[in-house]
Each structure stands twice: as C-alpha cells, then as structure tokens.
Amino acid sequence: MIPFGLNGPSARAVTLSVGTPDETRRPRVYPRAYPGAVPEQRRGLLLGVSAYGLWGAFTLYWPLLEPAGPIEILAHRILWSMLTMGLLVVVFRRTTQLRAILADRRTFLLLAGAALVITVNWATYIYGVNNERVVETSLGYFINPLVTVLMGVLILGERLRPLQWAALLIASLAVVVLTVDYGRLPWIALVLAFSFGTYGLLKKTADVGALESLAVETTVVAPLALAYLAWLVATGASSFGTEGTGHALLLVSTGIVTAVPLICFGAAATRVPLTTLGLLQYLAPVLQFALGVFVLDEAMPASRWIGFVLVWVALVIFTAEATNHHRRQLRLTVHASAAA
C-alpha cells in the first residue's frame, strides 16, 4: 500500500510531493483574498480523496492477482513500479533531481534503507489482504500516526504534550485488548505501522521528491525481485504467462496502481492545508476496515470491536489535539507578524 502511507503517506510526507514542475513546491497557504484559492483547494481536496480512496480500495485489487503468491506479487510490483516511476521521472522532467540523489551518498543510503523497509511493508500488506486479514491491515494504518509520534519520541527525542501521551496510552491499551482477542500479537498491524513509520522517518530525513525517491527505492530492490522471478520461471512455478493474458496484464498493472495515487497525493499536497491532509489519511484505513467487515465478512467479535473503538478514541484525541495546536501556532504567528 502504500500504503502508501503511503501513512497512505502521513502529513509529514507532504513536502515529498510529486507532479509537474510547478506542483512540486512545498504546500502553499492561500490568503482568503486570493481569487484562485477556493477552486484550487477544492481540486486539491478531490485529488486527496482520490489518492486515499484508491489506497483503501486497493484492498479488493490484490486478491485479483492470485494464484500468484504474495512474494511473486511483491516482486512484480517492485519491477513494474521501477519501470513506471522511471518513465514518470522523464515525463515530469525530474531527471536532474534523480541525478542529484545518485550523486549524494548520504541521500542514496537513506533511500536504500527506505527501499528495504517499504519492501517489508508491501509484502506484509499483500500477505494480510490475500490471507483474509484485511481488518488487521486496517488497524496498522489506523495506528500509524500514533506510532510515528512514538518513534519521534524514542528516536528524535521529541517531547509530547499531555493529550498526545493520553492518546498513546489508550492506543497501547487497545493493542493489549486486541492481543487477547486474537490470541496473539496483531503482528501484521504492528509490522505495517512500524515499517511505515520508519519509512516516513527515512524519507523525511532524505527530504527529496516522492517520485524520484520511489524510482530509486524500487531500483535498489529490483535485482532481488528479478532474481526471484527468474527462479520462479526456472522452476516452473511462475504464474506470469501461464495463467492467461488477463492475469499477466494484472501483474503488469501493479506499476500503474502504485503510481496513480502517488501522483494524486503529490498534486493534492500543493493545494490543501496540512490539517486537511492529516484528516484525509484516515480515509484509507476506514475503507479497508469497511471492506473487511461488510464486504469480505471477516469476523468481528465484541472484544475486537472494543479494541478498535479504543483505537478510534485515541485517534480522535490525537487529531483534535494536533488540530488545536496547529491553530494556536498559526494565531501566534499572525500576532507576532502584526506586532513586528
């Protein structure tokens, strides 16, 4: 998935946007008097909803790739995403930025690390969705913002405000409840949340555009993907070319499936406020959860509902506190500017 994030991507990934050269700036704040602000923000909202909506709806896409196994699907996604991203880098004229990444050893190593982490994330997500654990995968993306904050405390030494601590404690209680319910740790959710949190941290540190970044990341792991696919062909275990043209085209389409929501997100990030993107990020796990429960009929005993309700309470507290804090900071900035 992306989860993309693909916290889909978290609000912290906003500056890693993609698009045309004019769309790759940092998110803009439109003054109320600006005549094009409202249409631009509406367009951005539509693009943001499209991005997160697609990430959520792809829950129904990955099972279509069976009888290919999760690792074969992953290998094809890496390969076709690399080719798709390479083409888009040329189309959007990002080759200069790509060369700069390759010339900077530190940035390249950060993206190489990100490549390994997102590979784990993609593999876990595909495995979960194709093994009737869609609800558990949605949990991973619900708790991802909280895990990202926790990693900020543990790795970056950031300080939390009281309500942020409260949200983390409630979310921790939810994990305990769900562990008892499942009879095991909800490992799929935890791997998804922590892998995407780590991915976001590495990308934030690298601070490069998402399009050329993903082109580099998929190129780093492409040799492993190609080697695995070659082994499948050599052993007669490959589904590509043996399950019909439709199946082969679906595997090829994994590159487009990866690219389209990423482009929508990048275009949205330049048009809507951070707070709006922060709220939109919950659309993907909400759709995943709804599809898992109401379409795919996954079991939801009472204890599991309790665990998820606790997660949602934690997210309400976390989001409300973050929104209020952002507004206070804006007011302070306005007052400081007026005083100057």
Spans of features found by a protein language model:
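Membrane-interface interhelical linkers
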Residues: 7, 22-50, 83-111, 162, ...
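Structural motif at transmembrane-helix junctions in multi-pass transporters
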Residues: 67-72, 123-140, 263-280, 299
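Hydrophobic transmembrane alpha-helices of multi-pass small-molecule transport proteins
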Residues: 85, 163-179, 188-194, 303-322
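C-terminal transmembrane-helix exit sites in multi-pass transporters
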Residues: 127, 144-164, 286-305
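Helix-helix packing/entry segments at the starts of transmembrane helices
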Residues: 139-143, 210-220, 259-294
